[in-house]
Amino acid sequence: MKLKNIILSTALLVGFCACDDLFEPAIENHKTVEDLENMPAWAVGLLGHAYISNPLGENANSWKFTDVATDDAVSNDVGNGYLRMATGAWRADNNPVDSWQYLRASWQYLNQFLEISDKVEWAKDEMGSELLKMRFQGDAYGMRALYMYHLLMSCAGWTADGQLLGIPILLESETIYSDFNKPRNTFRECLDQRNRDVEKAIEMLPEEYGDVETTAEVPTKYTQMGADFSQYNRVFGDHAKNRMSARVARAVRAQAALLAASPAYSEGSGVTWEQAANRMAEILANLGTNPIAAIDATGNKWYEDSNGIKNLVAGYN
């Protein structure tokens, strides 16, 4: 009898000491929009996704080996995408040259970032927070323009009734309740949206990133906000090199203008070769009056310059 009481008491003790949420799942570590407002490092991660799938970087497989994508060459790698396409494995759910999915996924992240960026406390001091917000927002607008260009290059085309269409322009992030059957905007409307994003990027970003030594060297748009050189370096200094800048945004606009002026699209885009040339001239003007003279005579032997190699760490050589 005594043994039974011990067993019963032990069972009751275990029962009363068990977890009270045995049948309720624990809260997962998924951040909400409200969480991100107080977590700037996480919030800027949304912008970081646009760089992970950057169409100009190898993470997005932009630099594809296409020498075997011709009629007179074939890969002997049985897993090669072009070989599989040529032998009947090219399907809607197996497209080795697909770019729509990763480009639109990054577009979604950029929209999510822009929606919360005004609410995030980017730094404890007001000036630092404003400068960081300005840089991150300009970065996002510039990257969205870059993605628009690559989406048009991959997906724009003429319809059977003679319309030149681009992509559906989405300026808000999508949710499970969004309308996923939005019609494609015209090519011209897509160009106009890309130009608006480029203008915002130019308005917010410096021409190039890099440390300055005096406040006199800080671009006017930042000194008008009250920023000195140390605050400028903190946000736009050497550590930010290779991010979207005003010069890169202009280059994106010039490239898209060349695409729009090409014979494939000019009739529907309304962009002429002269307009495209003028856009490209804005970029070439940065090279100076005699760019040929500025070319390093021994630049083809960069590997012999030890200082240049050391400077790669800082993002330049």
Where do the model's predicted regions map?
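Bacterial Sec-dependent N-terminal signal peptides
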Residues: 1-29
